A protein has these predicted regions:
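Short, functionally important secondary-structure microenvironments
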Residues: 1-66, 73-140
Length: 140
């Protein structure tokens, strides 16, 4: 696992911005999650314990990097990974034996992006999922 001095400057700058501008997210990031840098990571991802970032993240302007870091932290704060594991193990839905992880991830992304954009935390990348039809109607 990379340590702070092994992370590229764009990652360190985004983390420093969180410390100064968004201490709630920074405290969670610094105490509950690790950051790994894997250049070929297509966007960003988390398993609830580690956030994996790559060249895609580094190429973004700082406000987008801040948004993405807060997005990944919120997945953990809101328990999305834990609930996905539980639903996968138990089953979920009308037939109680199928859980669609892709659909779950998209739904939680819509929810998180709605929170972050309404709170004016960073700037969501163009690839982000956001639809005003879902504002205030999701409970992920």
């Amino acid at each position: 696992m990379p340590t702070t001095h092994q992370l590229p400057e764009p990652v360190i700058a985004a983390r420093a911005n969180l410390l100064m501008q968004h201490p709630f997210f920074a405290s969670h990031l610094l105490t509950k999650q690790r950051i790994a840098f894997v250049p070929e990571t297509p966007t960003a991802k988390t398993n609830g314990k580690q956030i994996t970032l790559g060249d895609w993240f580094s190429a973004r302007p700082l406000p987008q990097r801040v948004f993405v870091l807060c997005h990944e932290v919120l997945h953990d704060i809101l328990g999305h990974m834990d609930r996905a594991r539980m639903y996968t193990a138990r089953g979920f839905g009308p037939d109680m034996n199928v859980f669609d992880t892709t659909r779950w991830n998209k739904a939680t992304d819509y929810y998180i992006n709605s929170i972050l954009t309404a709170s004016k935390i960073g700037i969501m990348p163009a690839e982000g999922l956001l639809d005003p039809r879902y504002d205030h109607s999701l409970t992920a």
